[in-house]
Amino acid sequence: MKLIIALLFTTLTFVQFKDDISVVQFSAEFLVDKQISLRKFKQFNTHTIFMSEYKKFFADEKIEYLPTIILYNNGDEILRVHGGMSLTLPEDTVKQLQKNIDELLQNKF
């Protein structure tokens, strides 16, 4: 029974991770020091997903570089920022995210 509940919870999380405004960081355990803190965006849906746990998810989202951050709005990809060959996100990643989120919020009204 616990396994069924755990699987159901995991499925719901996957379905909901792109709801409304969501900031999703795709990464790997060995890159923890290269990730950015998503605390600034805590009023939105934020998730950090590790490749070792959800390989299929990475394939479905066509993640080519780590780390990668994707901003979604109601399931639509708005912005994708990745670390490229250097495995390091650009210095202005947080600014890019905030700019796009501000635009999304302005367009809601």
Identify the role of each PLM range.
Residues 3-12:
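Sec-dependent N-terminal signal peptides
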Residues 16-48:
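Local sequence-structure signature of Cys/Sec-based thiol-disulfide redox active-site neighborhoods
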Residues 34-35, 58, 81:
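Short glycine-/acidic-enriched loop or helix-start segments at secondary-structure transitions
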Residues 50, 61, 89-93:
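Extracytoplasmic/periplasmic, Sec-exported soluble proteins
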Residues 51-57:
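N-terminal post-signal-peptidase region of extra-cytosolic proteins
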Residues 61-72:
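Structural micro-motif
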Residues 71-109:
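Non-catalytic, surface beta->alpha helical segment in thiol-disulfide oxidoreductase systems
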